[in-house]
Regions:
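Conserved tyrosine-mediated DNA breakage-rejoining catalytic core shared by Y-recombinases
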Residues: 116-159
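Catalytic-site neighborhood detector that most strongly recognizes the C-terminal catalytic loop/helix
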Residues: 137-139, 238-266
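Short, basic (Lys/Arg/His-rich) helix/loop patches that form interaction surfaces
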Residues: 167, 184-236, 240-244
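N-terminal DNA-binding recognition helix of tyrosine site-specific recombinases/integrases
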Residues: 13-56, 111, 185-186
Length: 283
């Protein structure tokens, strides 16, 4: 980011939101460097260059600059999630609230979430609505192009029918008034202020921040996975599932109906059915 003012011509054709304005996180730097290293290694293998510049770094230096580290995952507890769901918010936060709740229901990465549309909604023979899509991040390594199938719980259906996945706020995820900022404002308004631990590289020590300051689209996926993991454990411990049954295996290995029941329990939602037009069938 220090080179933006020094060499403005390099950034003249780049969209403003893509121009670096602050120091990148170490993990981001490490990932980009690994990509560059792979590129130069291939050039070296093809004899297009004599030697990769990464060889000049030395083993120890390369290890340092490419090191990735991750804090303990930050997510909403079930009671915190339900608090957000049940809190009336100002009109300025309503769209962000509903987009956030919907993304938490699916646990989708932000790029996948932004690309969703009504064509991705399917109804099973049992009347269970679910979302079906190909995750973009793993598309290249997904040899058989296996799709993700996520049951749609009751509150998520209402949001989908209202917005049809057309959330204007998702046009800008980052930025001063983007989706991530609105998520933080939403969580602050709902008083989601539990202290969470974050490692500060400048002081080389842990610092503690209110959870709402850590709000972003990434929080949705982590919240989704934590809620499902905990409800599986709770159902097993309480005797609802026998040891070795499919219900205590990894979530993704369960049948659609099992996953639907599990998700309804995790999010405190009623079990329901719909017709092919997504109308709820009263029983």
């Amino acid at each position: 980011y220090k080179y933006v003012e020094k060499y403005p011509a390099l950034y003249s054709e780049i969209k403003e939101r893509c121009v670096p304005s602050k120091e990148r996180a170490q993990n981001t730097v490490a990932i980009k460097l690994r990509m560059l290293q792979a590129f130069y290694t291939e050039l070296e293998d093809r004899d297009e260059i004599d030697v990769s510049p990464f060889r000049k770094l030395g083993k120890n230096r390369r290890k340092v600059v490419m090191k990735e580290s991750y804090d303990a995952p930050v997510y909403l507890l079930q009671e915190e999630f339900l608090k957000v769901m049940n809190t009336d918010v100002p009109a300025t936060l309503q769209e962000a609230k509903e987009a956030f709740l919907l993304q938490c229901a699916f646990g989708s990465r932000i790029d996948d979430f932004k690309s969703l549309n009504m064509d991705k909604v399917v109804v099973s023979a049992e009347g269970i609505p679910y979302l079906r899509y190909l995750p973009q991040k793993t598309l290249k390594s997904n040899e058989h192009k296996d799709e993700v199938e996520i049951p749609i719980i009751r509150y998520a259906l209402d949001i989908i029918k209202k917005w049809q996945f057309n959330f204007p706020i998702l046009k800008y995820v980052t930025g001063k008034s983007g989706y991530n900022v609105k998520i933080r404002k939403l969580l602050e308004y709902c008083q989601i202020d539990r202290e969470v631990k974050v490692f500060d590289k400048d002081s080389s020590d842990n610092i503690y921040k209110p959870l709402y300051t850590m709000g972003s689209s990434k929080l949705c996926r982590k919240t989704h996975l934590d809620m499902l993991t905990k409800v599986q454990v709770n159902m097993y411990v309480s005797g609802h599932h026998k040891e070795g049954s499919s219900a205590v295996k990894h979530y993704s290995s369960l049948m659609l109906k099992d996953r639907f029941i599990l998700m309804c329990a995790a999010y405190k939602q009623p079990i329901y059915k719909v017709d092919k037009q997504l109308n709820v069938i009263e029983e």
